[in-house]
Amino acid sequence: MGGHLFLFRDGEIKMSIITQMVLPFSAGVAGNWYHTLTNSSTVNVNALLKDSSSKLCPIIHWNAIWHHRIATEIATQIFDGLRVQEDLVQKYRKKYLRMFSTLPLKSNKSFSYYVGACSLDAITKNYDKTNLERLQSITEELSCDGCFIEGTHYSIYCTETIGRAFSLLDQFYGQDEVWILIKERIGFVTKWQRRVSNTEGVVASIGDSWYEEVKPIDEEGVYEYLDMTIHRISKWVIIQNHRKSKFALHEHPHLDEVLIAYGDKWIVQGSGMPSYKQVMANPLKWRRPRNHFISEGVYDIPWLWRLRKKENRSRSVVTNENVIRIIDSGYKTIRWPIDDGVRYIATSTKVQWVYNGCKFTCSGEIDAIQEDFAYQSVRYREEKKIRVVRIQGKNLQTSVEPCL
């Protein structure tokens, strides 16, 4: 019961769709529809709404984000001048509002559902305060203090989703105090995204994520959030994680991990994920806490690592223009990446090695050195295996400086 679709083109009388007889569009088919709507003028939206609105508004769907984005896109295109039969849009809105929206869970999926709902409210001039208030509640929880609790990729998904409909929503809701709160929160998230990016705008891989870009920002300072402290000095961006927020979808065991960028290059970017397909094929591989450059603990097991989130912070960062230092207090086993084919130079008080164009030097009372590995997403559907050096000792200090 597969799905094929024939797009309406200029000169044709009708768009025909052969789809599943019972099930709604799959995530893949819905995704194709969304991208077709955004990139082509060949889709007859009247015919789409008439022939397949039940397929576009599934009552239950495991991952309905593309259906949400289709609703937002249709409303926005109408706002931009597309002519559609008003009764079809009204019927579509009513069906959409009956769609399962991952309630009561507040997540990127429920966020995009309510962006779609508010967009349809706006384009049909139905001032439903309930939808707007629910969107504000979800936005407040996800955005926290600006540091998006589901990580960089899903923060970009949410800001792009609401950004597409921003002019429509802003014109309709205007000075509504709830809408003003939503705009303020989205502004905080956008600023955070830029603060966790390097000089080219490539963001850190926080949570389920991969190589993505935002508009770079030219600012220096130390920015304290509940879940991390961001240090921006000269060409350095250092993200000192200290995750405290409660459970969130797509959360990773960053714990006390330190992420490092120098100029346009990420030295330690974060594990992320290459794609759902690859993660689900090897869940233990991609949910392995020691894919991250954390100080090790007894609960470094998939899903149990959250028991470590309440640990006291015993890691600090010192920055200057040329060298940064990561200071680990007490007795620990720490992890850092090392280039393939490179030997580390070790004594009882110092270990030196090179990774990604930077020289690492770890000093302190060193008891043991071992090797391990980690996995990292590079771009969407791309991954690499990273060689790791594990250093066990007391009061360890790691300096990082660019190679000449």
Stretches found by the model and what they are:
Residues 1-186:
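Aromatic-lined, polymer-binding surfaces characteristic
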Residues 4, 226-230, 257, 290, ...:
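Short, acidic/polar N-cap/turn motifs at the starts of alpha helices
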Residues 17, 23, 32, 228, ...:
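Beta-sheet entry/capping signal
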Residues 58-62, 246-248, 280:
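Catalytic micro-motifs at enzyme active sites that drive phosphoryl/nucleotidyl and oxygen chemistry
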Residues 63-69, 102, 190-198, 346-359, ...:
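Short, conserved secondary-structure transition motifs
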Residues 113-118, 153-267, 374, 385-395:
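Carbohydrate-active enzyme catalytic cores, enriched for enzymes
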Residues 268-272:
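Catalytic Cys-His active-site segments of thiol-dependent hydrolases/isopeptidases
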Residues 274, 278-404:
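CBM-like, beta-strand-rich accessory domains located in the C-terminal region of large
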